[in-house]
Amino acid sequence: NGMPFETKSGDVIDAHIYPGPYSPEPTAERAAVLGEFGGLSLPVEGHKWSPNVWGHKKAADLKALTAEYEQLLAKTWELKDKPGLSGAIYTQLTDVESEGNGLVTYDREVIKLDLERAKAANTGKPPGQP
């Protein structure tokens, strides 16, 4: 359900933090999940649904967005071991009507970050590491 609406029920304790990352404290009965984090924004003119899109944290360009993404994912990987994060969901893969938080534009024509570096970040390995 995401914080701050914690109900202390179910098998998962879920947090939604922007940009994050953050991990709730897991318990013997409940796994910790970061249900939403990220929200890095890079509006691309000519590829937005609306001129009024917003994002949680605006990047200056592709290089800056890639670096921010790498930092977020590196910190997220650290949370796997302490406190024991079981899962994380980056928000969001594509821009939507009113939000420019996607890694790809609304029309799916522009990828907003370096894919090879993002792939390495997603696997928890810096670029150049096997």
Where are these regions (language model features)?
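Active-site regions of enzymes building and remodeling cell-envelope glycoconjugates
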Residues: 9-17, 29-32
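Alpha-helical scaffolding within the catalytic cores
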Residues: 2-3, 14-26
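Substrate-binding clefts and catalytic carboxylate motifs of secreted carbohydrate-active enzymes
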Residues: 22-130
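Active-site neighborhood of glycoside hydrolase catalytic domains
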Residues: 1-12, 71
